[in-house]
Design a protein with these regions (language model features):
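Conserved active-site segments centered on acidic
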Residues: 1-78, 139-142
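Phosphate-binding/catalytic loops
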Residues: 84, 88-142
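Cofactor-cradling patches in redox/metallo enzymes
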Residues: 81
Length: 142
């Protein structure tokens, strides 16, 4: 089982987009049974909240459902459980380092920051970045 975890600030935009896009990709590739995919936040700000409505709309416009998601914060058990943990930007990396000093599992989702659409308002660009990163991850892991 390949275990993938996506991390962003609040777990209501970028990391759930990563989670549900990759779930959709592995399902379409017929390999969903080989993957466990989830997403979390580094902060506690949005705990329990669903996917942010503009992010949900962007995903739905591409046929990707994200129903049932509720934001949660990363835990030590997540770090222990997941083999591949991807953060969306350098701020997330700093939070992760503070929460789990010296942990070596954390990797950048892309070689550049994925801008937070909560601030930019550009959910389409975030969608494109997420798809790019998920395609690369899927290629590397399958």
């Amino acid at each position: 089982m390949i275990k993938v975890l996506f991390v962003c600030h609040g777990n209501i935009c970028r990391s759930p987009m990563g989670e549900f896009v990759l779930k959709d990709m592995v399902k379409k590739a017929g390999i969903a049974d080989q993957f466990e995919i989830a997403s979390v936040a580094v902060s506690r700000e949005e705990l329990g909240n669903p996917v942010y409505p503009p992010a949900r709309r962007e995903m739905h416009s591409h046929g990707v459902a994200c129903d049932g998601h509720h934001a949660r914060q990363i835990t030590r058990s997540d770090v222990d459980k997941f083999d591949h943990i991807y953060y969306m930007d350098s701020s997330n990396a700093r939070y992760l380092e503070r929460l789990f000093p010296g942990e070596q599992k954390f990797r950048a989702f892309l070689p550049r920051n994925v801008a937070d659409p909560w601030y930019t308002g550009d959910f389409t660009q975030t969608w494109l970045d997420i798809c790019e990163g998920c395609e690369k991850i899927l290629e590397e892991l399958k």
